[in-house]
């Protein structure tokens, strides 16, 4: 696939794609954003995406800072799924932030199981290709190995429940390295994947701000490519399924999760251009989670497209 094979953004016509794994017929890297859905997954979320000229979308299906597991609106679900399919728009779900399978608190772990199961089920209902979940931390002063054993105990059964052809992938997103994080550097994905038997429905969502804040310097002529090489060496080819394209307000290794608009932070534009030339990112969508509201989001989507196509 090359840039000349790109299809249009939301609001243009296109062929219905096969949804399971790849995004056939799309540009090398579809660029889109996380969109608000309060008031309607289709009527509000996709309307916002159209205003961004988004080629990919990410949504919440529950309050990201709570444990509620609301049922979807069947009409909105079907309209969203149909529009994404008809217009070749890959969609993703971001699971709630409170989920932590490494917690020392039994209630938190139990709620994490139900919350993620809900996100995975809702992901299938709306035709999402993947559900993003943060990798969590080892709370209560426990060893990382103990927390990872607990991750295995509770998360592996959820992966084994993904038996339908249209079930989404579970995409692990590393953190900026705050506290007792279970996964922040590229090599931390290794023990996490081992704990989950490198399950076939397991993938990675790479957040550029997080990995930069954790200590991977993405700047310079080869910083981004070296980081992606390390990731592939750790988890294998084909596991990178989604990229959260965010600049960073803070310097490399600051362990602060503060996103900035593309080119306005300490990462800068060039690493994002390099990102979209590495073999591991072929066909992988980019989702922005940057400041500035709709105007800022639209500018970031446009900027990433220019870096991709220029």
UniProtKB/Swiss-Prot annotation:
Pfam families: AP_endonuc_2. InterPro entries: AP_endonuc_2, AP_endonuc_F2_Zn_BS, Xyl_isomerase-like_sf, Xyl_isomerase-like_TIM-brl. It comes from Streptomyces avermitilis (strain ATCC 31267 / DSM 46492 / JCM 5070 / NBRC 14893 / NCIMB 12804 / NRRL 8165 / MA-4680). GO terms for biological process: base-excision repair. The gene is nfo. Transmembrane segments: none annotated. The keyword Zinc applies. Residues 1-31 are annotated as: Disordered. This is Probable endonuclease 4. It catalyses: Endonucleolytic cleavage to 5'-phosphooligonucleotide end-products. Zn(2+) 3 binds at residues 210, 257, 259. Its EC number is 3.1.21.2. HAMAP family: Nfo (MF_00152).
């Amino acid at each position: 696939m090359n840039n000349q094979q790109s299809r249009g953004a939301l609001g243009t016509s296109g062929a219905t794609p096969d949804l399971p794994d790849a995004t056939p017929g799309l540009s090398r890297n579809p660029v889109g954003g996380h969109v608000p859905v309060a008031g309607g997954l289709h009527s509000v979320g996709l309307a916002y995406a159209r205003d961004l000229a988004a080629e990919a979308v990410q949504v919440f299906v529950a309050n990201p800072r709570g444990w509620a597991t609301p049922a979807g609106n069947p009409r909105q679900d079907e309209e969203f799924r149909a529009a994404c399919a008809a217009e070749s728009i890959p969609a993703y779900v971001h699971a709630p932030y409170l989920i932590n399978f490494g917690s020392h608190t039994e209630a938190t772990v139990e709620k994490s199981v139900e919350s993620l199961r809900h996100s995975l089920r809702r992901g299938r209902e709306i035709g999402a290709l993947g559900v993003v979940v943060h990798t969590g931390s080892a709370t209560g002063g426990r060893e990382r190995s103990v927390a990872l054993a607990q991750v295995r105990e509770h998360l592996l059964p959820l992966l084994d429940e993904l038996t339908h052809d249209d079930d989404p992938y579970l995409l692990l997103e590393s953190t900026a390295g705050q506290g007792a994080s279970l996964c922040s550097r590229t090599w931390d994905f290794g023990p996490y994947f081992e704990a989950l038997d490198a399950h076939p429905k397991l993938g990675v969502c790479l957040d550029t701000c997080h990995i930069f804040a954790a200590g991977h310097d993405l700047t310079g002529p080869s910083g981004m490519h070296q980081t992606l090489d390390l990731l592939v060496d750790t988890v294998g080819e084909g596991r990178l399924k989604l990229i959260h394209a965010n600049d960073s307000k803070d310097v490399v290794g600051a362990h602060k999760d503060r996103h900035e608009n593309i080119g306005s932070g300490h990462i800068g534009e060039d690493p994002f251009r390099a990102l979209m030339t590495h073999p591991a990112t072929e066909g992988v969508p980019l989702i922005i989670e940057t400041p500035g509201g709709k105007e800022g989001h639209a500018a970031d989507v446009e900027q990433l497209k220019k870096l991709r196509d220029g």
